[in-house]
Amino acid sequence: MNLNFIVPDINMTFGDMKFMGLNRERYVYDRENNKRTDVLESRIYNIASAVQGGQIEVTIPEYAGAKEIPPFADIELKNPKISAMATSQRDSTYANVMWKLEADDIVVKGGSSVKPAAATGGNEKK
């Protein structure tokens, strides 16, 4: 059985979370031509975690859109997953583990990631 990702208990793992802002954008890499493309793959945001005791990065897919959340606003992560990748150097007995936090979306606490439908304007009185 392969371990693909871990679904964390939000309160125990992160506690209260605050939005800190955009860290960087990640673009699709064309391995065939060995260069970065102009196609946006994901955005990486910084969030503050009360339990972790500092700032952590969360990766959000491109389709979630850019986040216009005020700094230090209380936030929630939608469907968070933690994955790990270990690397070691040749002939070494040590490994470096890199943890990656991904989520489907970041929303203001109590809010929703679903955007309201646009008004049709058909019911307006003239």
Swiss-Prot record:
The gene is ydcP. It comes from the Bacteria. InterPro entries: DUF961, YdcP-like_sf. This is Putative uncharacterized protein YdcP. Gene3D superfamilies: Conjugative transposon protein, DUF961. It comes from Bacillus subtilis (strain 168).
